[in-house]
Regions:
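Active-site environment of divalent metal-dependent phosphoester hydrolases
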Residues: 13-16, 43-48, 70-81, 115-120, ...
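Extended active-site neighborhood of metal-dependent phosphoesterases/phosphodiesterases
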Residues: 51-134, 139, 174, 201-204, ...
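Short acidic, glycine-rich surface-loop motifs adjacent to enzyme active sites
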Residues: 141-156
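Conserved beta-sheet core of the metallophosphoesterase superfamily
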Residues: 160-237
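A short C-terminal boundary segment appended to hydrolase-like catalytic domains
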Residues: 230-269
């Protein structure tokens, strides 16, 4: 079995330092095999925010895979935004914008969907898709295949279609053919679990599309939260841990279980 902590939209600069410590404590207790961070580590891509994010990560002694979000690109510094958009991210977090994690049970591929030309929304291009496909297709058939982006492949009910990852349909067609099982994203500050089959309707393919909420003060009506995934093919459970201020703990609010079938992943609870 593999355990992944899926954390997104930390937004250092808009994160209570006391809560950051509680998040670290919760993650240490879980002791995940991988920490997956799906972007927006900072609020305005400032040096001090990246330094705080790096210190936060360095205190967690677990393998990690990180991708940038749109807030990790400078907003007000026009030169930096268009010429060196991810220079601070690459200096302080990781130089790798196409990270890959592999072990005996899963392969996890990260994609940079942040773009200088858009303020909020993101995009995936054909070259990136081909690179992800290459990694996914090269794995044994029983290995779980996971893709991590900041911008989402699916949307919770009521969210405008404009918030969807740019060129998502093109990407999903090819990633489905490569056997993608699971998509992790953030950006919306809303928790969500969906099936790719509901939106994309690709015959014989139904991947899980999972959104993490935010732990920052930039909430959208939800309490600070993150996800814990427990993966043991053909089963995946997804737990949502939510901050309970009265008890000063992250507690499980919801758990969903899924089972893999000939047509993809289906809910089993």
């Amino acid at each position: 079995m593999r355990v992944i902590v899926h954390l997104s939209d930390i937004h250092f600069g808009r994160l209570d330092p006391a809560l950051a410590a509680r998040i670290q404590q919760a993650i240490v207790r879980i002791a995940p095999d991988l920490l997956a961070l799906s972007g927006d580590l900072t609020q305005r891509a400032r040096k001090r925010e990246f330094l705080a994010a790096r210190a936060f990560l360095d205190a967690l002694p677990f393998p990690r895979l990180v991708v940038p979000g749109n807030h990790d690109v400078p907003l007000h510094n026009v030169f930096a935004r268009f010429v060196t958009p991810l220079a601070r991210y690459q200096r302080f977090i990781t130089s790798d914008l196409s990270p890959v994690y592999r072990d005996e049970e899963m392969v996890v591929v990260g994609v940079n969907t942040a773009r200088s030309l858009t303020v909020g929304e993101g995009r995936i291009n054909a070259r990136q898709v081909l690179e992800v496909v290459r990694h996914l297709k090269g794995e044994p058939p029983d290995r779980i295949r996971i893709v991590v982006t900041h911008h989402p492949f699916d949307l919770p009910e009521g969210v405008k279609e404009a918030r969807l990852l740019g060129r998502a349909r093109m990407a999903m067609t090819q990633l489905a053919a490569a056997g993608a099982d699971l998509f992790l994203a953030g950006h919306l500050h809303l928790s969500h679990i969906g099936h790719s089959a509901e939106r994309y309707k690709i015959a014989g393919h139904s991947a899980l599309v999972v959104q993490a909420g935010t732990v920052s003060t930039r909430s959208r009506g939800e309490q600070p939260s993150f996800n814990v995934l427990r993966i043991e093919r053909p089963n995946i459970s997804i737990e949502r841990l939510v901050w309970v201020a009265e008890r000063e703990v992250f507690a499980e609010e919801a758990a969903s279980a899924f089972h893999h079938t000939a047509n993809g992943w289906v809910r089993s609870n």
